[in-house]
């Protein structure tokens, strides 16, 4: 028995222009799914109510979700891989959407957070800090740097602000035919970023 998984993962690492186009379309449908979620935010709805609306809307379009849709509110939204439940949407809380759509055999994966009601200054500050960290990674990433270095660019912003202990997850990951592909953008990963990775 020969395990070919590492070879297949390597073959799928660099995407063709056609594959990139398919993932862009999948991303557009993910944006559409998030909009369905935003349009269904109501204090009388639960996390699972909103998930049902999103999943139904995408099925009606003829598409499947690329993984189980997550909508999380309140403290549940702080968990990177929380479990949706019958928690009602909370006023003045954050609502997290983590979802993806599978289109023509290619996946998208998107996370969005929205404030329900008026966010307080702390939530605004954390949002701006997260945006700054994301921008630091986007400004840094290019062919020739390592996945670890990209993660580090964002992580340093969070750490300098005193919130490093709460950055308890990798920065990101590749997508393609599967929702989680290489490269894994995380501490300790010395994989070199190449043109065509997605």
At which residue positions do the language-model features occur?
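Active-site neighborhoods and metal-handling regions in enzymes and metal-associated proteins
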Residues: 1-198
